[in-house]
Regions:
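Gly/Ala-rich beta-loop-alpha elbow adjacent to hydrolase catalytic centers
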Residues: 52-56, 60
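Conserved serine/cysteine hydrolase catalytic core
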Residues: 135-189, 195-198
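Post-His helix in hydrolase/transferase enzymes
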Residues: 208-220
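Conserved alpha/beta-hydrolase catalytic His-Asp/Glu region
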Residues: 99, 103-157
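Flexible "cap/lid" loop of the alpha/beta hydrolase fold
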Residues: 61-65, 72-105
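Alpha/beta-hydrolase active-site loop signature
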Residues: 11-15, 81, 203
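Catalytic histidine-centered segment of alpha/beta-hydrolase-like enzymes
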Residues: 199-211
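Active-site loop/oxyanion-hole signature of alpha/beta-hydrolase fold enzymes
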Residues: 5-51, 216
Length: 223
C-alpha cells in the first residue's frame, strides 16, 4: 500500500464533521465527489477506490453510479440496500432519538453499544471506537454524531445503483441486516454488476469482528 493516499471521511453529522440542518445521501455523495476531485487536482491521483460500510456503502455506490468516470473500484461492506419499489410510507422510522449528556466520560463510554446489537470479541477495538466517538461540551459528555440526523435523513427511495466499475459486496455471515431474504434480494438486483464475498463468524460490523480479514480482502482486491 505504499504510494497510496488513504482518506478516512467523517460524513456530515458524524465524527468530527459539522452538523447540518438537513441530511441526504445525495449531499453525502457530493461531499465525497468534492474530496475525489480535490485529490485529483492537488495530488494527481488517477486511480480512485471507494470503500464504505453500512450507510457508507450506499454513499459509495451512489458516487460510483452518478460519477462513473471518477471511481475505479467500489467495495460495499454489509450495506442494507432497499429495492427501488420500497415504499417508506408503509414503514415506521421509530421514535426520535433525544440528545443526552453525561456528567463523566467514563459513564458515557459504559453506554457504548453497537447497532444493530451484536456481540464483539475484540474489546480493544470497541474501546478505541467508543473513546473517539464522544466529546465534552458545556452540558457534559455526548456522542459526536448529530442525534437528529437519522430522523431527517433523505434516503435513496426509488433509486437503483448503476455503477459500472469493478465492485465487491462483503457481508457478515451472521449479519442481522442480511438476514431473511435481504441478501438474496440484493444479489438478485446486483449480481450482474457486483461480486459477493461472505466473511464467516462476522455480524453486521464486519470490520470490528474480523479486522484482519477485511484488510486482507481489501488489499487483495485493490492492490
Amino acid at each position: 500500500m505504499q504510494d497510496t493516499n488513504i482518506v478516512a471521511v467523517d460524513l456530515p453529522g458524524m465524527g468530527d464533521s459539522g452538523f447540518r440542518e438537513e441530511y441526504s445521501i445525495k449531499d453525502f455523495g457530493e461531499c465525497i465527489i468534492s474530496i475525489i476531485e480535490n485529490e485529483k487536482i492537488e495530488n494527481g491521483i488517477d486511480n480512485i477506490s471507494i470503500v464504505g460500510h453500512s450507510l457508507g456503502g450506499q454513499v459509495a455506490a451512489y458516487v460510483a453510479s452518478e460519477q462513473k468516470e471518477l471511481v475505479n473500484n467500489l467495495i460495499m461492506i454489509d450495506t442494507f440496500i432497499r429495492p427501488p419499489d420500497w415504499d417508506p410510507s408503509q414503514h415506521d422510522g421509530g421514535p426520535l432519538r433525544m440528545i443526552k449528556h453525561y456528567p463523566e466520560k467514563k459513564i458515557i463510554l459504559e453506554r457504548f453499544r453497537l447497532l444493530p446489537q451484536q456481540d464483539c470479541k475484540n474489546d480493544w477495538f470497541m474501546r478505541y471506537i467508543a473513546d473517539h466517538s464522544v466529546k465534552e461540551t458545556d452540558e457534559g459528555w455526548r456522542w459526536k454524531f448529530d442525534d437528529s440526523m437519522f430522523n431527517s435523513l433523505e434516503r435513496l427511495f426509488g433509486y437503483k445503483f448503476t455503477f459500472d466499475c469493478p465492485a465487491l459486496f462483503i457481508h457478515g455471515a451472521n449479519s442481522l441486516l442480511m438476514s431473511g431474504n435481504i441478501l438474496e434480494n440484493i444479489k438478485d438486483m446486483y449480481s450482474d454488476i457486483m461480486e459477493f464475498k461472505e466473511v464467516p463468524e462476522a455480524a453486521h460490523h464486519v470490520p470490528l469482528d474480523k479486522p484482519m480479514e477485511i484488510i486482507d480482502i481489501i488489499k487483495n482486491r485493490l492492490f
